[in-house]
Amino acid sequence: MVSPSIEVLNSIADGKKYITSKELKKHNNPNDLWISILGKVYNVTEWAKEHPGGDAPLINLAGQDVTDAFIAFHPGTAWKHLDKLFTGYHLKDYQVSDISRDYRKLASEFAKAGMFEKKGHGVIYSLCFVSLLLSACVYGVLYSGSFWIHMLSGAILGLAWMQIAYLGHDAGHYQMMATRGWNKFAGIFIGNCITGISIAWWKWTHNAHHIACNSLDYDPDLQHLPMLAVSSKLFNSITSVFYGRQLTFDPLARFFVSYQHYLYYPIMCVARVNLYLQTILLLISKRKIPDRGLNILGTLIFWTWFPLLVSRLPNWPERVAFVLVSFCVTGIQHIQFTLNHFSGDVYVGPPKGDNWFEKQTRGTIDIACSSWMDWFFGGLQFQLEHHLFPRLPRCHLRSISPICRELCKKYNLPYVSLSFYDANVTTLKTLRTAALQARDLTNPAPQNLAWEAFNTHG
């Protein structure tokens, strides 16, 4: 481990030991990982391996002051665990920007009002709704011989998966159940068992996404080559820090990206297949995974009941159609997720702890809708509000929206809120812009005759 150098400063006045931000930055790798919170420096090298949110958020913000991110993701009870990680050093040049001060004030006010604990009755209503949907789906498959009823059942299953995903999202961000044990059970049951998508995989990728919102090399939610690219910066075959591999922009990627504005909706219709694959790859990997056994068991339960349900349909054409319909309906949710970020500002490089608020505002897009449609979007139409306060139950997001809007206005930061239609149009324009840039053969990328033949006819 690197020892503090001559830049370590000793204060005679107060007896505290100090280091500078420059010194702190030297401790920025998995084997020597320091962070600062409210100006106190902590060594989280070993703790990163046990961190409930995974090691990626800590590694991505290593060597920086992470106060705003810590406040966003941790309840008040987490502060007491910091003492055992304290290095004894304070940050000599620790400063708080005006916007961070206002952000922390808001978080404190919300906490004092009990908003992080007041979850409303939305979870109960959602669970009842999902139960009805799943029951209707199973009944339609087992007790009807009508092709159209079977297709309706597939659509209902897709709708149920959408609502379950919102519940899984809630369970992953905050304790929606009475105890942590029940919350863990709920996450695995509704995630792994009902949808086939591991809650462990979701936490791993989603926490990294929140910390590095719209970083092309750190945010996994923007790393979709060879199928999609939201920026021409991806044409440089940058390295994904999250996956630890190069995002190769080769002739195959160039071809798909060149037509991505046409392929976008078809890809979203079958995007679920990729989530199943990612779940399996993670669970069989050597990576340390919390509750690996439970995650594997839950996933096996899904791959037992789902094929059995599909097998009760009378023939293979109906089975394939049923699966496709269910995937297409839940594909609406994949569209929702991409609308929130694909057209936001993107950048290359690691996230920075000192511009937390700014990066969240520039990388997110809200979807404007009436309150009666909140169930359909699962609260995630308030994407900026959710990114600023990820632990806040979704029932409060609409009420804090005007407050966040005013704070953005105060500091001349974007607060983008579009209708569902306009958000789709904006996303397609973003994809089309990158597609046309990909067709420019003067951009550096491996080429071959097949690609040139495809491009000959535009």
Swiss-Prot record:
It is an enzyme of class 1 (oxidoreductase). Pfam families: Cyt-b5, FA_desaturase. It is a multi-pass membrane protein. A motif (Histidine box-3) lies at residues 383-387. Keywords: Electron transport, Heme, Iron, Lipid metabolism, Membrane, Metal-binding, Oxidoreductase, Sphingolipid metabolism, Transmembrane, Transmembrane helix, Transport. The chain crosses the membrane at residues 122-142, 147-167, 185-205, 264-284, 293-313, 320-340. InterPro entries: Cyt_B5-like_heme/steroid-bd, Cyt_B5-like_heme/steroid_sf, FA_desaturase_dom, Fatty_acid_desaturase. Its cofactor is Fe cation. It is found in: Membrane. A motif (Histidine box-1) lies at residues 169-173. PROSITE patterns: CYTOCHROME_B5_2. GO terms for molecular function: metal ion binding; sphingolipid 8-(E/Z)-desaturase activity. It catalyses: an N-acyl-(4R)-4-hydroxysphinganine + 2 Fe(II)-[cytochrome b5] + O2 + 2 H(+) = a (4R,8E)-4-hydroxysphingenine ceramide + 2 Fe(III)-[cytochrome b5] + 2 H2O; an N-acyl-(4R)-4-hydroxysphinganine + 2 Fe(II)-[cytochrome b5] + O2 + 2 H(+) = a (4R,8Z)-4-hydroxysphing-8-enine ceramide + 2 Fe(III)-[cytochrome b5] + 2 H2O. A motif (Histidine box-2) lies at residues 206-210. Plays a major role as delta(8)-fatty-acid desaturase which introduces a double bond at the 8-position in the long-chain base (LCB) of ceramides with or without a hydroxy group at the 4-position. The enzyme produces both the 8E and 8Z isomers. This structural modification contributes to the quantitative partitioning of ceramides between the two major sphingolipid classes, glucosylceramides and glycosylinositolphosphoryl ceramides. Sphingolipids are important membrane components involved in environmental stress responses, such as resistance to chilling, and act as cell signaling molecules. Belongs to the fatty acid desaturase type 1 family. The histidine box domains may contain the active site and/or be involved in metal ion binding. This is Delta(8)-fatty-acid desaturase. It comes from Helianthus annuus (Common sunflower). The lineage of its organism: Eukaryota, Viridiplantae, Streptophyta, Embryophyta, Tracheophyta.
